[in-house]
From Swiss-Prot:
A GO cellular-component term linked to this record: extracellular region
GO molecular function: alpha-amylase inhibitor activity; serine-type endopeptidase inhibitor activity
Species: Hordeum vulgare (Barley)
Protein's name in the database: Alpha-amylase/trypsin inhibitor CMa
Compartments where located: Secreted
Tissue specificity remark: Endosperm.
Length: 145
């Protein structure tokens, strides 16, 4: 049987390990409303529709001023998301294959959702917003889940 003096350090080590694990997990959430806005990348809808189908969304702000174009607004919103949550923000934006109705994207006249999804997958890349992600590179892996 183990003595009291050997159990105490083991118990202390276990408690410290669980406290450390909980502390490192704090702030790592990437859910809509927790770590991300409730509608992640809502500001990217206009840019994605323009790029994929050449259409504008009724009611969207129209500007060609430097820093206030649809691409600028989209990239700013993506840049404001925590780096470790950017791919998850794109995932929410395009919707999961298992729940396509949960997408921020909408079928528009002359602009189906699928081409918009395909374009939105590259929003983080160097040719678009060029932001670092959880992979510490401007790419998101596994967005077709």
């Amino acid at each position: 049987m183990a003595s009291k003096s050997s159990i105490t350090p083991l118990l202390l080590a276990a408690v410290l390990a669980s406290v450390f694990a909980a502390a490192t997990a704090t702030g790592q959430y990437c859910y809509a409303g927790m770590g991300l806005p409730s509608n992640p990348l809502e500001g990217c809808r206009e840019y994605v529709a323009q790029q994929t189908c050449g259409v504008t969304i009724a009611g969207s702000p129209v500007s060609s001023e430097p820093g206030d174009t649809p691409k600028d607004r989209c990239c700013q919103e993506l840049d404001e998301a925590p780096q470790h949550c950017r791919c998850e923000a794109v995932r929410y934006f395009i919707g999961r294959r298992s729940h396509p109705d949960w997408s921020v994207l909408k079928d528009l006249p002359g602009c189906p959702k699928e081409p918009q999804r395909d374009f939105a997958k590259v929003l983080v890349t160097p040719g678009q917003c060029n932001v670092l992600t959880v992979h510490n590179a401007p790419y998101c892996l596994g967005l077709d889940i």
